[in-house]
Amino acid sequence: MLDGIFPSAGRRDNSQPDGDKEKDEGIKIDQRLVQITQTAVSGFALKNEGLRFIERSTGHVFESDSIGANKTRISNTTIPQIFKTAWDSDAEGALIMYREEENIRLASVLFKGTSSEGVLLPADIISFDYAPDRDRIIYLVKTSAGLTTFAANPDNTKQAEILRLPPADFMIGWPAANSISFLSRPSGEAEGVLYRFDINKNSFDKVLGPALGLGAKWSSNGAGVMYSIYDRSIKKPRMFVYNLKEGKTIDLNVQTFAQKCSWPGGEDVFCAIPTSITAGIYPDLWLTGEESFNDHLWKINISTLQKKDLADLQDIDVNEIKNSGDGKFIYFQNKKDGSLWGFRFEE
């Protein structure tokens, strides 16, 4: 491991993080909705009772408390043009994919105090994730024969080949300790599938699909999946929940995307639902930015299907969304400008 990313992997800012905490809080839109950042972030993670996030323009890592106050820069490594991140379970490390001139790079970075250490990972990795419960990473490598899945330590030592697959366009995930997921890249013009590989049983099974526009997001405990499909008859998305143990599908009867939802693992799911959706091919139009939305934040009970409109998010098109571990907040990114927001639940 090196102090900072490889020189070819990022530009080192020799100035040290000042460690001074900004006294201003996040911008309060109302008593419960808070704008954590005014600038774009390239990913965020929950950290104790606060947040860690990466500033998109510089690649600097910051942390704050739960309402965006006391922001502190904790990284002195500059990596611009970050477009995808995955964090470890305690937000002490991250996998960071970024552009460097004409190349795509992937770095594994460990944040230690006010410094960072990192290594470049192989250039042929097409998808990656962190283990939910231990210090291991998983990644998918494209080969001439298809795809190979590897697990390794974050510095890419102690590699282990997990699985080989025929050629496909999969996004890999690690939703539970013994489960690895493989999801087709979603498009309303192609049928997608979701598979799960059970590490203990060495079994590879289909969970969902084939379905047009299939997008999926696992519950926090990996016991269920929220998923959206493209309904060609209405030219809009539809949202469902699937319970793996019971093999039961629940139609939430709302029009939104799996990427806009969070399931902490109980009876309630939380979804950002657009006020209106123009008929078209989804999620393609949304993912490419040709269509954007103004969302409301809803809570939906998956047993009773009772719905509660929690907030008008005004000009926010929710992209990434996560519940805090203490259940007091939900955080999300605005796809329109990349800013980070938080919503405080009622006590």
Predicted regions mapped to residue ranges:
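Sequence signature of WD/YWTD-type beta-propeller architectures
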Residues: M1-E347
